[in-house]
């Protein structure tokens, strides 16, 4: 076992193991090459995107296509593509960093970029054969052609495998004829290549096809959809009427389409999270700057505690989201590297590396998309009446952020998926949660210790709380499995509450690990606000976990069992020294005021 493999946590393992802060990646660990790439993308956005904000809001689809072509000329579309197919072949973390930086200024461009570089290109990169990759991927990487992903249908949304689009083999066996209707297809208006999912005969699972958008081949487009947000992202229905597709354009193998679709979503989920981060930072900065300028009652509104509270909360959610997203991104990159070194092909290593962290990807998608919307909403509130005006950046940010909770599987689906996949891993023997869950059960039967632990060392209380919050999850999961067995997935409200416990543990621990690592590296004084944000978020996470766990316990138990579980919850969410959250928020806000921007 390599040193790397020994030190990194496996997917989902965070809930049963303690992680050393030295073994996590933080944004402060970006290397020189990554920072140069980030700056290049930032400069591109400042020059090519920000001056045209009004055009993007006015449904200028041509502008989006033009900007995408320019991004292709600069190589930004090819970061994740192997060098043999015209790409940069950069790692997973670098791919996420480019995605973050290019996505924050404009939701329309974020959608177009994500749809093309992700689900419009990577299914061929990861599932296509050599000939398919050589034929299509260099053109996708350069921006010579743009890709689009045709999965959703009028009757097949979350239930993606229920699509009715048909693929019928021609009599001469040389083509499939695809007939059906796809909807909500991003980039459809300018895509020259479609990844299309259709069912062959009465197959249980759908099949993927690479379908060039050629004239006179039975492909027609609906009108541009009228959407709440992302106004200049092309979104249309795509109709196929006996569209001829050469048999050699089948992607992977027959019946493998559902697997392709699900694995594409895994990558899409963490990419959606990272795409929100720069937008969150920008909204933070806009709100801070406005609050520093706006005067009411002869006082700058940033000096009112009601505004300080909002700004501190917005900054905290941004810091935590960034901490968790890049933690997971590096874990995925490391797992891909380990698989490469053990002899896996590029495709196998990439697919298995991401698939292992499907739980974390779902967690991030939910947490960061909801924080993004909350931050945009509070940004409007800080702007007051001006925030409701399309003349300010807040109105567009709020509308664009709403789609995040729907993309890549709704947040409800992802919540249930995170817990379901964790339990499935346990049942398959890939993750031992049975032993720690059993140990938690034994601990509940013992008389609790009333000894106050030594809390003099920085984060000693926070580490203890994180450790105990993991026990809360194990307690709830164990009780749920014991009562409902394999029918647990039918109890969706219970799963949604349990998943919120899982989410808060991962997010809070990620912030703690980042801050602890950077305190060791830069010193406590330079990390004082990060320490405050970490403590603030954890305290709020405990509040959420107490509420969610109580609902689960009350709904799934009664009598002595219920009383025992509630006592266990009280024990595992105990604070010895309560943080002064009002003071923490005021001090965080004072730094934001002096820096006049998001600065963490």
Predicted regions and their residues:
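C-terminal helix-coil-helix/basic helical segment that borders enzyme active sites and/or dimer interfaces
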Residues: 53-58, 319-367, 380-381, 485, ...
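A structural signal for short hydrophobic beta-strand segments in well-ordered beta-sheet cores
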Residues: 165-169
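Glycine-rich phosphate/cofactor-binding loops in nucleotide/flavin-utilizing enzymes
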Residues: 2-23, 97-98, 119, 375, ...
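C-terminal amphipathic alpha-helical interaction region
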Residues: 444-600
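Glycine-rich phosphate/pyrophosphate-binding beta-alpha loops
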Residues: 104-107, 156-157, 183-189, 267, ...
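Glycine-rich beta->alpha junctions and the first turn(s) of the following alpha-helix
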Residues: 3-4, 27-30, 37, 220-322, ...
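Amphipathic, small/basic residue-rich leader segments at the start of a protein or domain
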Residues: 1-114, 131-135, 139-146, 158, ...
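A short core secondary-structure module
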Residues: 174-220
């Amino acid at each position: 076992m390599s040193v790397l493999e020994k030190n990194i946590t496996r997917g989902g393992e965070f809930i049963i193991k303690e992680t050393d802060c030295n073994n996590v990646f933080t944004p402060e660990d970006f290397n020189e090459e990554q920072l140069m790439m980030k700056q290049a993308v930032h400069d591109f956005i400042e020059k090519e995107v920000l001056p045209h904000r009004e055009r993007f809001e006015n449904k200028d689809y041509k502008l989006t296509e033009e900007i995408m072509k320019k991004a292709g000329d600069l190589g930004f579309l090819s970061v994740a593509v192997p060098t043999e197919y015209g790409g940069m072949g950069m790692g997973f973390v670098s791919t996420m960093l480019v995605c973050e930086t290019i996505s924050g200024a404009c939701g329309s461009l974020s959608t177009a970029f994500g749809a093309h570089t992700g689900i419009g290109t990577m299914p061929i990169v990861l599932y296509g054969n050599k000939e398919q990759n050589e034929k299509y991927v260099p053109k996708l990487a350069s921006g010579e052609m743009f890709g689009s992903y045709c999965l959703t249908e009028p009757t097949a949304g979350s239930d993606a495998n229920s699509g009715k689009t048909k693929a019928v083999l021609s009599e001469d066996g040389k083509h499939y004829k695809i007939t059906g209707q796809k909807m909500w297809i991003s980039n459809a208006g300018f895509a020259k290549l479609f990844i299309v999912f259709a069912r062959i005969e009465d197959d249980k699972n759908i099949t993927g096809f690479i379908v060039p958008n050629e004239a006179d081949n039975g492909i027609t487009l609906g009108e541009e959809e009228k959407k709440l947000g992302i106004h200049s992202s092309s979104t249309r229905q795509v109709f196929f009427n006996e569209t001829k597709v050469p048999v050699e354009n089948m992607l992977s193998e027959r019946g493998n389409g559902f697997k392709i679709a699900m694995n594409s979503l895994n990558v899409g989920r963490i990419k959606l999270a990272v795409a929100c981060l720069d937008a969150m930072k920008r909204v933070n900065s806009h709100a801070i700057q406005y609050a520093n300028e706006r005067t009411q009652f002869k006082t700058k509104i940033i000096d009112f505690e009601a505004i300080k509270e909002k700004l501190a909360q917005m900054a905290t959610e941004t810091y935590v989201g960034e901490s968790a997203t890049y933690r997971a991104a590096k874990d995925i990159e490391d797992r891909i590297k380990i698989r490469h070194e053990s002899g896996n092909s590029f495709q196998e290593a990439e697919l298995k590396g991401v698939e292992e962290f499907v739980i974390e990807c779902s967690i991030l998608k939910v947490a960061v998309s909801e924080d993004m919307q909350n931050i945009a909403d509070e940004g409007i509130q800080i702007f007051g009446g001006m925030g409701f005006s399309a003349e300010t950046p807040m109105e567009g940010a709020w509308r664009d952020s709403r789609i995040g909770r729907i993309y890549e599987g709704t947040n409800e689906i992802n919540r249930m998926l995170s817990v379901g996949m964790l339990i499935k891993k346990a049942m398959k023997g890939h993750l031992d949660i049975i032993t720690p869950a059993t140990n938690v059960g034994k601990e509940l039967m013992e008389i609790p210790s009333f000894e106050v632990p030594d809390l003099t060392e920085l984060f000693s209380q926070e580490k203890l709380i994180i450790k105990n919050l993991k026990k809360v999850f194990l307690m709830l999961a164990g009780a749920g499995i014991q009562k409902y067995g394999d029918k647990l997935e039918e109890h969706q409200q219970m799963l949604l509450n349990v998943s919120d416990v899982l989410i808060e543990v991962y997010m809070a621990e990620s912030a703690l690990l980042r801050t602890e690592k950077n305190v060791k590296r830069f010193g406590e004084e330079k990390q004082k606000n990060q320490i405050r944000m970490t403590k603030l978020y954890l305290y709020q996470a405990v509040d959420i976990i107490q509420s969610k766990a109580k609902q689960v316990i009350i709904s799934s138990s009664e009598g002595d069992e219920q009383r025992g579980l509630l006592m266990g919850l009280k024990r595992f969410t105990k604070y010895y020294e309560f943080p002064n959250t009002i003071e923490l928020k005021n001090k965080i806000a004072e730094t934001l005021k002096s820096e006049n921007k998001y600065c963490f």
